[in-house]
Amino acid sequence: MSDKKRVYFRLDAPKAGAVVVLGDFNGWKQRVLRQDKKGQWATWTTLTPGRYEYRNQVDGEWSNDPEAPAAFNEFGSEKNVVVVG
């Protein structure tokens, strides 16, 4: 049985033209989110248990998700955090 869990990333940005999520779970490579009719951007990914830092880029500008937990890393940068258990 796999320890991997499905994780849902969502961002409310109805006026955005493009949204991606980047994190230490994927080597900080862009993962494209898809927009629904209400302006919600979302994607699913599968992760092993652990703590992951991530951020979004909205139309090329770095952004944190105000609805998700955040923490400062060792460099003093604020990033969103997801814990997979």
Where are these regions (language model features)?
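Aromatic-rich carbohydrate-binding modules that target alpha-glucans
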Residues: 2-51, 57-85
